[in-house]
Amino acid sequence: MKSCMEIMLSRRSTKKYSDRMPERCDLEKIVEAGLWAASGRNMQAPVIVAVTDKEIRDRLSRDNAAVMGAMSDPFYGAPCVMVVLAEKTAHTYVYDGSLTLGNMMLAAEELGLGSCWIHRAKEVMARPEWVEWIKSLGLPGEYEGIGNLVVGYPDGDFSAPKPRRDGRVVWVE
């Protein structure tokens, strides 16, 4: 089994997926990792909406593409989308949701699944039809979309990692 550091160093954003849905137990492990992310004052503001329904997934993709001004699938064909929302009442909700997404990406890597953080959840989830959808899920409160994590089996190989840029660490001793 890979160490945590090995997982962090091997993870890449997957931009091409097979249409095979990951096993439910693996998706549940990814969600569990997200739920255990650190959060400001332990408010646990993020909520994860795991979407495996193809019709909803395709609507999310279409609306995300419209916000981006693109015609292609911004979810790269991934069959599962995990929408991370967060309660806006928590002062650290954006940071908390970001940590949730990070934990989930690392969990996907450990399980041999590909993942990619897709932006524009804020804009899509602010649309009236998606605000109503959030309410229909039984989520009380006011939520903001933090990010979408697409998850699936990679279709193809990964390129070698790019070197890290210099000058990004300063030690004060």
Where do the protein language model's features map onto the residues?
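Acidic, surface-exposed loops and disordered segments
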Residues: 1-173
